[in-house]
Amino acid sequence: MLASALRLRRRAKTRARERGIALVMVLGAIAVLTVMLAEFQDETSAEAASATAERDSVQAEYMAKSAVNLSRLLIATEPTIRGAIAPLFLMMKKTPPQLPVWEFSDRILGAFNDEEGSKDFSVTVGVDAKTGKNLGIKDGRFELVIVDEDAKINANLGAANDIAHIRLAQELMGLMAPPQYNTIFEQKDGTGQFHDRLSVCSAIIDWGDQDEQLFNCDLTKLTGASSSGVEDAFYQLLPKAYRRKNAPFDSLDELHMVRGVNEDFWATFVDPDPTNPKKRPLTVWGTGRVNVNTANPQTLLGVVCAGAPQADICIDATQSQTFLMGVTMARGLTMGAPLFGSPNDFIQTMTGKGQLGPVLAAFGMKPVAFKSESEFGKSISTESKVFSVYAVGVKKSGIKRETRVSVHAVVDFQRTPSLAQANPFAALAAAAGTPSAAASAPPPNTENLQANATSAALNAAFPQMPVTAGHIIYYRVE
């Protein structure tokens, strides 16, 4: 009996030890699985967040791209809108000016935006956007600003011919001439050197021209191809050496590389307000002729001083401020409507004549005597052809999360037919074997085209169709 009891006792102890080992194994397995599941959850959550961010980024980018394309369409419709009001100007024996429809792009294109944009569109146009189909954006929006690049001084004139070099030198010196900017050129740069107006002007032109000759921006000597020896080795002597490009600027940021373009110069003459690109006096795109109807007051002052460097508004700070104030007030009264119908109207105004000349004189501004009114007239215009479109696509995800993608596109409307002139079916009709009727016939039936032309011929014809929405010459996504 005793032996049997001992055996039972030993067997119970063995079972107890075995149960303890099993418990440890189960707890260990649970711990390992917990770690694995936690890591798997973290990895899955990260991948899901990454996929969501990528999805939102793509959607935001396409919202911005849509805004760019809508802007191109809006600008392309301006000649048609201008034609509608042409009879009114003909009655007054005047040519209808270009209408700055791009200044109201956020309201006109609001029907394609979010609910808030649709409300702005309805208030502006008087039409309820909700009556349209497939309009508007859900869970997102786009923010849009269209900037007239022909309203600015084009630094890329330095990459053109000698006449363009002289014009750019005059405009740069005119822009920098007012005495309120003296302190900018009295400070040392990061290398301990001074850069006066002449050296900065020469550096900008020499960066873009194709020769190795130092351009002279002295206005008293600007009568031809002005050079004063060979370009120096300033850039090669910098701690991080590089060479002059001797080619056109590709972007505004490239101006940072030019001698004398420090932060003070940049904040005054290149990009005074990073949140408002319309205030930029300088550009690297454009036709080269400044639109006096859309140029900001600072740019207008520089352009006038280019043609009349000895005018009071160019050498007297009080007169400069009077001019800037007068232009700002006139723009405010017209609410964006063009002030001048032609370059000659602007010249007449600045010389104290015309309808606006006496108004500026009433403010105390003295008349301007241009060195050559005919030459000055060649540097200005009242019509713009090159525009920057700054579009931001905003994708909303959840309550607080927003994904933003910015697109900056520069669109050139030079040599672009208007919507009324273009016949998008001419190339297709030619491919169908009816080129003689392409210009005057109504839009051909697509089925007939398919029957009369091969698929290869049609594919070859599509690239030849006229582009009425301008040509994109610069494109950047951020």
Across the structure, where does each feature detected by a protein language model lie?
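Compositionally biased linear targeting/interaction segments
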Residues: L2-E478
